[in-house]
UniProtKB/Swiss-Prot annotation:
The keyword Phosphoprotein is annotated on this UniProt entry: no
Record field: transmembrane: none
Enzyme class: transferase
Any one cellular-component term (Gene Ontology): cytosol
Record-given protein name: tRNA (guanine-N(1)-)-methyltransferase
Database matches in NCBIfam families: PRK00026.1, trmD
Keyword Transferase: yes
Any one of the GO BP annotations: tRNA N1-guanine methylation
Family matches, as Gene3D superfamilies: 3.40.1280.10, tRNA(m1g37)methyltransferase, domain 2
Annotated family: Belongs to the RNA methyltransferase TrmD family.
Catalytic activity: guanosine(37) in tRNA + S-adenosyl-L-methionine = N(1)-methylguanosine(37) in tRNA + S-adenosyl-L-homocysteine + H(+)
UniProt subunit comment: Homodimer.
Amino acid sequence: MVFKVLTLFPEVILQATNFSILKRAQEKGLIKIEAINIRDYTKDKHKRTDDYPYGGGFGMVMTAQPIVDAYESIKSSKPHRVIYLTPQGKKYTQDIAKEFSKEEELVIICGHYEGIDQRVIDLIVTDEISIGDYVLSGGEYAALVLIDSISRLVEGVIEKKSVEEESFSECLLEYPHYTRPYEFRGLKVPEVLLSGNHEKIKKWRRYQSLLKTIKSRPDLINAANLTKEDIEFLIKYCESQKIVL
């Protein structure tokens, strides 16, 4: 998997991906991360990459020429997606991460200011993606979210079992985790986790996962692959808490 990030701040991308899992994945050749400086491609003598918006209004807009030229300089013959990170985009989900992880190459455009000239989107962008309903100082931080979440799904980057058990893998949030010591500031590890009974532990974790999801992200429940036992458990819980499903 190759990530090609078009950015005004390549050091943000390169420094943040030089640690932990992403660093090891690059060393093993499982992923490759390139940061292309958009400013290197501007034809403006002052190296500007932004200008005032037509029609007036607050803020500046990134100009089309350096972005498109930067893209054309690194564009390969391989099929690839070109992702623009924007609040106006489709909401990013684990399913989209899985879809992107199947690609050989992804080009990610990081915007700044009020965004990029619409003609960039019209000419080269295949996907407009938003990581949430909030505003960031630049697209680099959103790009790092994509790189990390997609890389984890690339075969060999992390253990397959870890991927399968993580939150959202079944449209459910993950169960609580505990480690030593047994008691900390009066709070003890649930006894079932010390029982050695793997079937009981599995059941407890499943129920905890269901509870976390219904409390924090009830919108995920409808998309989850629920068993008859799961449904019965949720009905009992919701009735006891007077929650309407």
